[in-house]
Regions:
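Charged interaction segments
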Residues: 38-145
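Short, extreme N-terminal segment that most often corresponds to the first beta-strand
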Residues: 1-28, 144-145
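Short, flexible N-terminal segments of the mature chain
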Residues: 19-47
């Protein structure tokens, strides 16, 4: 049995408040990277830090305090579009991309673009390429073995 290995990263983008952004990212399995923009401002990007090599995480374990003060661990969903919209400077677009494969059996790709208003577009290669391929001809086979 083969394992899926994915890798993900974002483009670089400007954030409203660097400390708030970095504080929130500390909750997620990501590495924050920076580079200098053309105007000298610091731009931020993310690299997936999934220890299993699976690409972007869509949930994380959070420690919440129960009614009696005990710490409860729970899985919480990560809505990346909402996260980026909350932090992006107006006019900037964050793009989250992931590619991966399970040997040569399944090859996949995903991209999400989102702006500060929360408007977004996504591409899922495993889903979207079929619609395009069928416009070119009637004989289209699966990309797998």
């Amino acid at each position: 049995m083969a394992n899926y290995y994915g890798i993900g990263r974002t483009n670089y983008f400007a954030v409203k408040d660097a400390e708030l952004f970095k504080d929130e990212m500390a909750n997620y399995p990501v590495e924050v990277v920076t580079r200098e923009g053309e105007d000298g401002t610091t731009l931020y990007g993310l690299l997936d830090a999934n220890a299993d090599g699976g690409g972007w995480e869509w949930s994380y374990v959070a420690e919440l305090e129960g009614e009696d003060g005990e710490v409860i661990e729970t899985d919480l969903e990560i809505d990346w579009a909402e996260v980026f919209a909350r932090h992006l400077v107006d006019g900037w677009v964050a793009i989250l991309m992931e590619t991966g494969a399970e040997k040569y059996r399944y090859v996949s790709g995903y991209a999400l673009a989102v702006n500060s208003k929360g408007e977004s577009h996504e591409i899922n290669l495993s889903r979207d390429i079929w619609k395009l391929a069928e416009t070119l001809g009637e004989n289209v086979t699966e990309v797998a073995y």
